[in-house]
Each structure stands twice: as C-alpha cells, then as structure tokens.
Amino acid sequence: MKRNITLTTLALACFMGMAPCKTKAQNTVPSASKDVYDFKSFTDTELLERFAELVEKKRKYPTNEELKTWGIYEELEFVRSHVRKRNIMSRTDRLVSDTHAERDLLMNIPCGSGKTYGGYPSHDFMSDNFSMWNYTNLFGAWNHGLFQAPGSWADAAHKNGTDMLSGMKFFDTTGGRQEGSGNWKNFITTKNTDGTFKYAHALINLLRFLGLDGINYNWEASGYDDENVIKFHQELYKIAQQEKFDNFHIMMYTSNSSLSTWNSEALWGKNGARTTELMLNYSSSDFTHSMGTSVQAAEQALGTSKGLYAGVWIVSMNRSWSRLNADDNARKCGVCLWGEHSESRFWSYNTGGDPNERMSNYQMLLERAFSGGNRNPLTRPSISNSGNDWEWSGTTPPLSKFAGLATWIPERSAIEGKLPFSTYFNLGNGDRYSYKGKKTAGPWYNMANQDIVPTYRWLVVQSETNTVSNAIQPELTNRDAYTGGACLQLNGLSTATSTDIVLYKTSLKGTQGDIYANVAIKSGKDGTNPSNLYLIVRIGNSTWKEYPVGDTTDKNWTEKRIKLDGISATDAIERIGLRVKDCNENYRLLVGKLEINDGVKATPSNIKDLTIQVKEETKTSLSVKASWGIDAQGANGLQGGLVYNDEGNIDHFEILYKNGENGRVSEVARTTQWAAYVGNIQLPKESDEPYIGVRSVSTDLKTYSPVVWTKIDRANQSDLPVAKDNPYGTVELDMVANGAEVAQKIRYITDFKTEGAEQDIIYHAEQPTGGANYVDATDKVIKVKQGQTVTVKFKGYEAKDNVDGSHDDLRYCMGKGWLDLDGDHLFNPADLTADPNHGECLFHLGKVRAGSPEQVQGLVSHSFTVPQNARKGMSRLRIVFSDAWFAGSLVPIGKFNKGFAIDFGVEIVSDNAERPVPADTHDQGEAAEPEGLTTTGITEVAGAASALQVTNEALNFNNVEKAWIFSVDGRLVEYLTSPQSYRTNKLAKGVYLVKMQNKNVIRSQKITVQ
C-alpha cells in the first residue's frame, strides 16, 4: 500500500504552514485564527509515555491539570467517545437467510476526508457522512494516527453497535520503501524491571480513557513475528479481558494473504491466547483464494475464525465476489473493504452537480454497495465479478448491477431495551441547521449528530408481506430537515393500494404509562391534504399494528402526537416502519421525526466546566469550540476515567445561542460528545453580545438540565478582519487533501477572455494566487444580452519539469463553468444545453483519471447562448477545477481537491420577460425557542477577551488568567499564572503556540521568536 503520512509529520507540517506573528511590535487577535484543531500533541508514543508514568504512580487516568500541561485538554473531548457501544441483537432472523449468521464486515477505510483532521466537526456541509453501520462490525479510521480517530465518528458507530479503531500504525518496506517497524517494535517491547511490558497497561488505559476500541496496523514489514511483539500483543488482550474491555481489537494487516500454522501465532494466536485479529492481504488486488484454509487455521489455533477478514482493494468493484461463498469454510470468513489512505473510494468516486446532489448521490451509492443495485436487500442483482462500475453510464447510476454486500453479510441492529426510541433521520451534516423546520444556523458537519441508521435500506414491500414493492422509493436527503440537517423523503413511483417501508429491527418495551409516537411530516402543499401515511409497529413475531399520522394543513412541517392504543409496556416492539396507502407517481412526503415514547422519567446530569474557544472571529462573525463535563461518575469515572452518557441519564446535548443576556434563545447544534464546534455565528452589529449555552437532554427525551451560559466578549473591532462575504457561497482549496501545495504553485488560470458579448473582458495572471487558490475577479464584468451567444476562452499555466520541478498542472484537472441565470445566487447543476429552462452549467472539460494537455497548451474555447428569459441584473460566472482523480469535488460551492477556482462578474441585460427566482421550499420565519427552557439557567462569569501584544523583547498579556507556551512539537515550555509580561529571550528561536485563558474562554495565538 502507498505510504500513509504519520500524524506527527502532518501536524508539524500544518503547524509550520500557518502564519505566526513575528516578534516585532504588533497587536494580535488570537480569536481570528482559522486553525480550529491542534493535534500535534496527540503522538502515539508521547501519549503512551504519559499513561505509563501514571501507571508507575498507581493511577490509570490523568487529571484536567495534567491534560492542560500535556497540551491536549482543548482537543481531547473531540477525540473521546462517551457513547457506550450498543450490543448487537441476534441475527438468526436475518433477511437473507443463506448468509452466515456470524459473518462480519470490516470497513478499513478513512473516516472523513484528509489525514489527521478528516471527519472532525466543521462547517463543511459537503463532507463524508458514511451511514451503513447496519452492516459494519468494525471501522478502521485509516486516515488517522493511533489514538486520534474522531470521537464523533466513534459516537455514530457505537450508537449502531459498531466498533471504532483509534487509528493507524503504518509500516511498509515493500517495493524498497524505508518505512520499517524497528522503532515501534523497540518501544512496545520495553519492559519494566519486573519483566512486565511498560506500555501494556498504558495502552489499554489510554483506549478506555478515549472510548475507542483498538489499534490498527498496516505492518508490511518485518517485526510482527518477533517473540516479544507477539507477547506484548497477547498481553494487551489479557489485560483487556481482565478489565472487561470486551470489544478491544488489534487489527493486523501484513503482506500475508493466508493464515497457516507457521504464521498463526504471530497473526492470530495460540493455545487460547489471542495475538491479533487479521485482515488477509488481497491477491492481485482481489480476494485471496485462501479464505477457506485460513478459516481452518484460525479455528485450529483458537477455536474460532471470528476476527478474520479477507481483504479487497476497492479501487475497482470488479472483483471475485464469487470466492466469498466458495465453500462452507470461506462463508465463515469476514470481509474487509480497503481503500484508500486519505479518503474512502466511496467518497472520492461519488459525484454530484452541487453539494446537495452530491450528498444525495452518496447515500444512494452506499445503498447500492450494501443493499444491492436495486437499493432493496430483498431484491438484489445476481452475483457478478464484472459490470460493477463506480462511474455513471449515461443515466445509469454506479453499482446498479452490484449484488450488494447484503448478499454475504447479514444486517445488524442494536435497538433493544426500553423505550424511548427516536430519530430525526439526521446523517451528520446539513447545509443549514434547522429547529422544527426553521433555520437557526448555517452549514454544519458533525457525525455525533447522526441518528441511529435504519436497519434496512430499503425494505419496501406490499403491506404485511415479503413481496417486493416498487411503488415507493425512500431516500435520505439534506434538502430539508425538521431538526438538524436531513430527513426521510418518500417518493411515489407507481400506483399501489398499500406499501410498507420496514425501517428498524428492534426489541423494545415500555416502562410506564401510555405509549405514544411523535411523527413530523411535510407535504410542501398549501391547504389541507391527506398524508396517506401510517406508523406501523410489529408486536412479537407476526402482529402488525397501524396508526394514521393524519393530514397536513399547510406546506410547512407539522408534528403529530399519536396514541399507540393496543400496545402495553409488556409488549415487545420488534419492527418499526411506515405504511403508505393509495400512492401514485405524484406522491411525495417528508418525514423529519419518528419517536416512540411513554411516561418514563429520568433526570439528566448537569453540565460543568464549560470551556469556550473562540475561532475565526471577524468584525461580523465568530466560531466557537465548546467542551464541558457532567456531574456524574460511573465505574471508570470514580478513578478519573471515561464516564458514559448513559451513566448520567443523558441522551445528547444541545448547544444554544442568544444575542444578549435576555435575547431570544435558538438551538444551533446537537451532539453526543462532550464538545461541539459551531461555525460562523453571524453578528451583524458591533453591539451584539453572543452567549453560548449547553444543556443535557435526558434519556427520556423530555427532561433537561439547566442551561449553562457563557458570554463571549468580543475582541476589539479595530483589530478584527473583515468577513469575506461571498453571496454565491465559498469555494476553496481543500488544504488537507493530498497535493494542495502543488495546486497552490502551478494549478491556476493564466488567461481568460470572452468574445461576442456586449462587453467583453480580458484577464491575465503572471503568477499563482496561492492560499485558497481562489481568485475573486468579479471587478471584471461581462455584459451579455438575453439570447446572445458568447464564447469564453481560457488557458491554464503550463508547468515545466525543468522550471517547476513538475508538470502536475491543470492538465490533470477536470473543470466546469456555471452562470446564475435566475438570480437565486445558486448554481443549478443541470447542463444548460440539456435543460435550457433550469440548467446553469455552461461547460464541462477534462477526463476522469486522465490528463488533458490541451487545457494548458492553448486556449480552450466554449460557447453558450444566454437564455431568452435569463433574469436581468448582476450575476456571477464561476469556473472550478478539481483533480481528475477526485471528480466528486468538482462542484460550485465547497472545497475542491487540488484545483483552482475563479469568479467573474456578469451583467445580464435586455427587455424580454425574465424567469422567476426559484422558490425556497424551506419553512420561513423565526424558529421557536427550544422546549423546556426555564429561568434556572446558570450564567458563568465572563472575562474580557484575552489579548497578546508581541514586541521584540516581550510577550505582553492583557486579560489573561493562565497561559501555556508550547513548542512546535507540542512540548510545554512555560506555564504562566496571571501573566503580565514574559521576556522572549527565555525562548529559543522558533515557532510557538501560546494558549491564553480568561475565566472559561480560551484563545490561541502562534508567534515566531527570531
């Protein structure tokens, strides 16, 4: 496999690439920093050293003060998972009966996009929100170093009964690479004076402190079969068993494509002592032929093949899928999908014309991969080793002919126990945050706000039968939301009397009182209209009960409370679904909430130690990172370890916002972590007073803790940057994607001109723009008339090996151009030629995974005709290039991969009738205040904004109670209390990070000492 850059290397490079303040007289604004996360202190060996020191002191876990000294306190809660992993229910009643009941799936792929920072909460709506946990046993987090996988992804996994590995340790000496395991081998085999392994207890304690479930190896080098390495790994399993850490894993991947008696002790175990779990290397990128014999070797060594996976490289899906059921032994072998290092092939291959279309396509691509090409696990295409194409073929979507992983892997559900059950069908992201249908905040991404996923995607049948129905097609969409950023959309395809969508396999019982449901729906139609929707639940093995949801009375979201007569607390609810009666091809309904509850009551633990970090502050906006604790202690909490949410009767947390002490309260985020990021809070007035509040929500879903509020004092307006407001949305280079630095140097447009317009323009660039690799050239305005044909010509910079050291320029990109023709400040993804009434995509150039030298060796020419009814006034032409190997990032808004973007102004003139501005179908108006607010909220005393003035001789602090100075490698250099001034001659030359705390608000600033 290709080299995986280590956390230390990447974090150091990222840190050094930031623009620090040099030690000359200058006022700095720490809160203006755009560097949201700082993981340079999360190196595996350093953390293990820290935890080994605690073991020597007869302790397992660190104090908060120690965490601050280590430099990880502010980021820690973004790495931890406080969601207890749910247990998987029996799979004996699996949908596809000829699958092996215990066969498991390992998704050994990245979480999120980009090394180190991928998957962490952000305001990037267009982000990887993998959701097929209903088939996944174990997730690999391939793009993160050990102990640094995002806790938000672990939360999503744990809710669905999936284990999350903590990240990767990478060794590869194949093909002459020099990435050996010697240093790591020597480190982990270090022993104490009594002969015990120094870091064994430390590693287990560290994982349990983080709430992550194991470690992941790519060990394509020597050393894994070293006697002491074997004993160390076996000792880890022994300690985990003693600690009742029952879902601990060591996932091993080596050059071996088979398990046998000669390597089983190193790669599997011996005499009842497990060494590792194993991903069998692929054979010529395909499944190994040795699945059956490897299963036999595993059973001979440990009596089980659980934890053995046959790997396949999913750069292509045309693989030998038929080998998976070659014989009875092969059928027992788990399956592992691998690919790739910084983002998964599912995400990089997925495309869409705009962010919403790409996100919808992503969920449907996942469904075809897992449930089969028909997106219904009950009716799958036949097994084929070819024709399983990643790309669209005309109007045929990718993987439409694939049999689906459901052919071999049984579905999984972890929804058991006591009511309540609730879902908003959230996927972990949104182009806005909505509360009861109305917008409260902007774009967001947080996998800790992904709801439990449906067990079946999608089990659509004729009512109360196992006969497949094609009358209704469900989909998860981000185009609207009741609360959060997504909802379930039901689309009618044909006429049918009654159709069931079976969503969840469950084993749920009530606690007390009447059982009821809350269901939120939206028809988008004015007036009173029948929803034709029924909630259905199956009691026991066979009895279905249906309950009408009722009519909609307008086009907006409405929430219905439904009494579930005939169900008592002793009845076991085994299936939950929806039924549509009398549907036709015009049927369309959104479902934004499905909750089943009863009279249960539980008091949630209170919030404590709320800390706010201010980021990305401008004159009119700011972002916040919040972290907190709770006043509960579980079994581990008594020793200073991890406390699970359920030990505090907590289902989730709500992040609230108000402008002014008595301002109107809005819910702006939810999470199951003890941390949250809320981006770009708008503060249009200098007098605005932002308050951030956090409260816990009970497991009963109707009881709340008091809100803990913190006022955010603004930095001086004169010192803050002006927000870059782009009415057409931000488009920028993905800085954590591979090759970003190459794009900044040699991927850009040098020449652009128009011909045939009322007013033509000429643009020329002598050098790259760098940074976000976006050029705002809207001061150059093209004037066009309705019905006029215009030609655009442009050329990319041609890089030369002897000049630039590379020719990796725009020839290796694909590009698109869009023109807003209806005045909605959006870019309709449809092609203008194919759809002249709606399309706004003018051209598409380049080839998938191939070079196009003509893009840099001469002017590329494209002509288009402005529609006769184009909306008059000022508009925008946007051109975006993205790497040809990452076609999914070629969209008009968001982050492009290793590419370039430029905007030009356009003025449309003439006297023809103009097309209307498309209606915004979201609910309009101000959102309601959150439920359960009381006057007993707690407002913590705020402190003035910390400030740092840097001179040639000193660091001068203002409004700082505590300060920490860290070196570039994360080492604490100095801890200061109530500092006024600090002499810089105490510091060696170099880059430092200064963290300053006043009350419970933290700001950070980088400095350079020269």
Where in the sequence are the language-model features?
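A broad "non-catalytic interaction surface" signal
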Residues: 718-920
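Chitinase-like catalytic core of GlcNAc-active glycosidases
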Residues: 98-290
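Extra-cytoplasmic beta-strand recognition segments
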Residues: 443, 488, 499-532, 560-562, ...
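C-terminal outer-membrane/trafficking sorting elements
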Residues: 6, 18-24, 932-1010
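Conserved aromatic anchor
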Residues: 622-646
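Short carbohydrate-recognition loop motifs
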Residues: 470-500
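Extracellular fibronectin type III
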Residues: 700-717
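Beta-strand-rich modules
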Residues: 678-705
